[in-house]
């Protein structure tokens, strides 16, 4: 794998998984045991988790029915 691609993926991963308090994405879901806390509306394209304005979702997008 190209080093630049690997670096970019690492940066994106850290951005998505860093809590908002530490400068991560503001809309990142807070998960408990891999599941988000509240029903979601919009899928986070980077992490695969769904997100909502406040607070976040209840389960992964892949587990959504329809």
From Swiss-Prot:
Residues in the signal sequence: 1-23
Intrachain disulfide bonds: 29-56, 36-50, 40-57
One Gene Ontology term of the molecular function aspect: CCR6 chemokine receptor binding
Expressing tissues: Expressed at low levels in kidney, lung, and spleen.
GO cellular component assignments: extracellular region; sperm midpiece
Location in or out of the cell: Secreted
Pro-peptide region(s): 61-66
Sequence similarity: Belongs to the beta-defensin family.
The protein's role, per its UniProt record: Has bactericidal activity. May act as a ligand for C-C chemokine receptor CCR6. Positively regulates the sperm motility and bactericidal activity in a CCR6-dependent manner. Binds to CCR6 and triggers Ca2+ mobilization in the sperm which is important for its motility.
Name under which the protein is recorded: Defensin-B1
Organism: Ornithorhynchus anatinus
């Amino acid at each position: 794998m190209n080093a630049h691609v690997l670096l970019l993926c690492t940066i994106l991963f850290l951005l998505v998984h860093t809590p908002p308090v530490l400068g991560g994405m503001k809309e990142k879901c807070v998960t408990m045991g891999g599941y988000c806390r509240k029903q979601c509306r919009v899928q986070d394209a980077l992490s695969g988790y769904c997100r909502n304005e406040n607070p976040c979702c209840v389960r992964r997008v892949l587990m959504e029915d329809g």
